[in-house]
Amino acid sequence: MCIVKYLSLIINTMTEHYSQLTGEPDFPSIEENVLKFWQENNIFKKSVDNRDENKRFIFYDGPPFANGLPHYGHLLTGFIKDTVARYKTMAGFKVERRFGWDCHGLPAEMLSEKELGISGKLAIEKFGIEKFNNHCRNSVMKFSKEWKQYVDRQARWVDFENDYKTMNSSFMESIIWSFHELWNKGLIYESIKIVPYSWACQTPLSNFETRMDNAYREKTSKTVTVAFELLESPKFITVENVKTYKILVWTTTPWTLPCNLALAISKNIKYCGAIIKHEMLIFATGYLKIFQEHCKKNNIEYQLYNQDISSVNLEDLHYKPLFKYFADVKNAFKILTADFVVEGEGTGIVHIAPGFGEDDFILCKMQDIPHIEGDTSNLLSIICPIDDGAKFTDKISDFKNMHVFDTNDQIINILKQKNLCFKIDQYLHNYPHCWRTDTPLIYRAMSSWYVEVTKIKDKMIELNKTVNWIPNHICNGQFGKWLENAKDWAISRNRFWGTPLPVWKSDNPNYPRIDVYGSIRKVFNNVKALEEDFDISSINDLHRPYIDNLVRPNPDDPTGKSMMRRVSDVFDCWFESGSMPYAQLHYPFENKEFFENYFPADFITEYIAQTRGWFYTLFILSTALFNKPPFINCICHGVVLDTQGQKLSKRLNNYADPMEIFNQYGSDAMRFLMLSHTVLYGGDLLLDKEGVMIKDVLRNVIKPIWNSYNFFTIYANIDHITAEIITELNELSNIMDRYIICECINTIHSIFNAMEELDQCSNNLGYNIKLACNNITKFFEILNNWYIRRCRSRFWSSEITQDKQDAYNTLYTVIYYMIKVSAPFLPIITEAIWQRLNFQKEESVHLSSLPNISNFILNNEDKQNIQYMKLITCICNYVLSIRSTHNIRIRQPLNKIVIYSHNCPDLLNLPAEYQNILLEEVNVKSISFKSDISDIASFQLKLNFPELGKRIPDKVKRLIFLLKNDQWKILENDKLLLGTIEAEHYVINNNEYTLALKVHNDFACTINLDQHLLGVVLLDNELSNELIMEGIARDIIRTIQHSRKDNKFNISDKIDVIIHTKDNIVKDSIKTWSQYIIQQTLSTSFAIHEEISDIQDINEYYKTTMKDKEVSVFLKKSHT
């Protein structure tokens, strides 16, 4: 029955069994309602509580700082975490999601300094540590409310009520316990070393902090080539009239020259000399060219010394100090040999300042430079005479209180005055900067406490191989290589707001003693508690300065005068975040059994730079404390940048506020955009500010899902249908129904396979969220553009037949299953549809389980059905491509297509019902098949001569001859016979040739499916008058339907239509196809007028003009 008659039966009798929306969906509004539903009904809590206590999925939520608003990187990480947690919950696991806050460290301290108007450690101490730390405590959660708003709006489920904070005493006690454990294992030591130092923050940094993000930036430094005057002439060098010998040294840090204590050369470098006036300058032969160019440019006359100078002749020679400050230091100011000296941009001789370079420090320590007798406590004041702000102390009297970077020019001027400056340059190089202040770092000697990572490095490398890294190249690449070069970790910070190091030392070096504590009160026999040695009744807070007040006499001092005082340092906040697996549970003081049963975590994710941050510190502490990896599966995602590849920043104004995006497009669209992008696996997401990419997701993903739901509800409500879930394929007979159910089942299997971690032999790492998203998109494209479109007439039939009921049940079933499996990836829109389609055995889709599809068993006919559907959709695409190439509109019917098969039985044996589908889809009247492809195309053979030349180089000329004579054929094993079997011939391997099929008709093209050639399709493009008139009729129908949509008519509205045209062909077409037009457009009345003046009440009509034709269409709602 036609749709007009069908709808005429139900007009004014419609009642909604399924909730539906009219007009365009307002997705942000829909999302707000869903969020409200979740909150009012405690859906998140129920989703956790309803799962089996003994079937847990452990997920670690890394703690962010709450002193700034979340950005797109946080949202991306949150979307991944939430998606995996939702998926595992629907898979039957209990997934607790406890939010955490990183409260200590530089971010909090710097914010407080800014708010209090103070700067530097001295200013803080003057202000008062207690008041400063109280301000840190109050300000650190400044944006926690905004964080919760962003997290809630992105539809991320986390437990804020039971959150953990690194500043809580329970968390801090677990930190000091872990330090105590490391101490007992011999993995903690105190040492003076060279560390990267932020003078702006007045604290050292970990070596891995200088490798995170874009810590290295381009910096232009002033370099100087300095002449150090030897106190004695080198051995075996005798030159008349040379009064002094000088060593040329190049440095990029002139400010370190006042602290020079030695020079270093290499045994593997040849040196030479050049005489200028009465001075010989000595340098590496590799520097000679630069030396000569400089002399030429500055008109400096020189004479080359004509013999090589061996390093042996230079070693142990002494030289005059450049400055007076440390001239009396013993065992200094001599030339040493070192392996780290290489020829490069410098002179082959390195200036050694042991307080400002790691190699320098190690070399001088080995050589006992400076030699200090007795107490060595003043070593740092000699080798590193700067204060916390990188200003010289009074040891460097001429530059006292000057920042080291501000002294370069003055130092160079002094060297010029002393005739010790040979050359000055500007040098552009990558230089580490403070990740917090963007200021260039310095490297300086400091006393710090270290975790001896090098002791456990081999075990970390071993455990790393047990982790499922995604992408998998992280294992042996970025993280694996980082572990191979792991260094000991400086964990102490000479700051204020942090967990204090639980170390007490004697204040008298004559009576040394160190006490390390691991708990506040005595809990374990093997863990030293503070209450054993101190009165802790007044200590309610482990922070400074309260814990600093715990002082006692040194038991090892018989005089009773020295005291045990806590070292002033606090922990690196990376140590705290690396401790979160156990510290959030107050392990081992509480939850001991729980932690030990469920460690390590099943899953973790952060952006890829955390391989040198949080992932790394987790790994160190987990290996050292528990001999286990901290997690089993890890996604390392990339970063979100603007379209120019620049970091998103307020200064550049190159991004939109995420909340504005949510309110305009919805968070599901943003979620799916990110989850379906390669950013999940370490790539960069270039996000446009205007929201173009998110609109694409709305159009291509969200709306198709909504449209399938909307189509079902409209017609199910019209028919008063209550659809049922299909549980077995044998309930269905229609090939379209069986096909879409099979596609649904296969899609669900694909999503399961993408998400589930399998054994490594399967090459499936699991957690392939992008692939799962692609499968969802692909299915709804098939559902809307194939199944629903192909089956519309079944839904439009007036009688409720079994076929019609099957169509409803089929559509209802695939929506039901796909909504469930899509819920983790699109949690809000799936919930909205779930509530409207009465799938409510469960209160929420997120309280349901992933689809159980075990009852659906695909037989051979189903598999063949899928293959045929795949085949005809493939052919459709090629035919439509030919139409597009030749500008033949799809609505224009054509006479026939011819399909030429190439070794494809499925093509030649295509059943009639599939042929009919194909013809309808491409709007063609008939189809024919041929088995001889040579009628329409020919193969072109190309030989891979580089490969053949390796195997049979002496036969290449004969191969060319046989090829030109077209003497070849394909063998069954995909090899090629060149020549004839009876005469000269060669067997060519499949990697030694390629075949290309060339068609001989512009209206033909090859058919390729899954990279296999199936044949050629030819489209007959000749048009008869009958075909032309039918095409015009279809154009008119489309014009009317577009006008209905543009003017927001309901799908059931009847209309009156008037066509205005003087075109005889158009009029003939309308007369011929009038009944078809009326049926397709719900027209009650239909008329043709040649003159506009003949149309009565024209103002009541909506007017549309057909493109490329002198035709106007007028329509209005019918009142009959």
Curated annotation (Swiss-Prot):
Cofactor or coenzyme needed: Zn(2+)
Motif 'KMSKS' region positions after renumbering to this chain: 647-651
Catalytic activity line of the entry: tRNA(Ile) + L-isoleucine + ATP = L-isoleucyl-tRNA(Ile) + AMP + diphosphate
Intervals of motif 'HIGH' region: 64-74
Molecular functions (GO terms): aminoacyl-tRNA deacylase activity; ATP binding; isoleucine-tRNA ligase activity; tRNA binding; zinc ion binding
Any Pfam family the entry gives: DUF5915
EC number: 6.1.1.5
Subcellular location: Cytoplasm
Single GO cellular component term: cytoplasm
EC class of the enzyme, as a word: ligase
GO biological process, one term: isoleucyl-tRNA aminoacylation
The entry's keywords: Aminoacyl-tRNA synthetase, ATP-binding, Cytoplasm, Ligase, Metal-binding, Nucleotide-binding, Protein biosynthesis, Zinc
Binding site for ATP: K650
Domain notes for this protein: IleRS has two distinct active sites: one for aminoacylation and one for editing. The misactivated valine is translocated from the active site to the editing site, which sterically excludes the correctly activated isoleucine. The single editing site contains two valyl binding pockets, one specific for each substrate (Val-AMP or Val-tRNA(Ile)).
Function field: Catalyzes the attachment of isoleucine to tRNA(Ile). As IleRS can inadvertently accommodate and process structurally similar amino acids such as valine, to avoid such errors it has two additional distinct tRNA(Ile)-dependent editing activities. One activity is designated as 'pretransfer' editing and involves the hydrolysis of activated Val-AMP. The other activity is designated 'posttransfer' editing and involves deacylation of mischarged Val-tRNA(Ile).
Known partners and oligomeric status: Monomer.
UniProt record similarity statement: Belongs to the class-I aminoacyl-tRNA synthetase family. IleS type 2 subfamily.
Protein name: Isoleucine--tRNA ligase
Species assigned in the record: Ehrlichia canis (strain Jake)
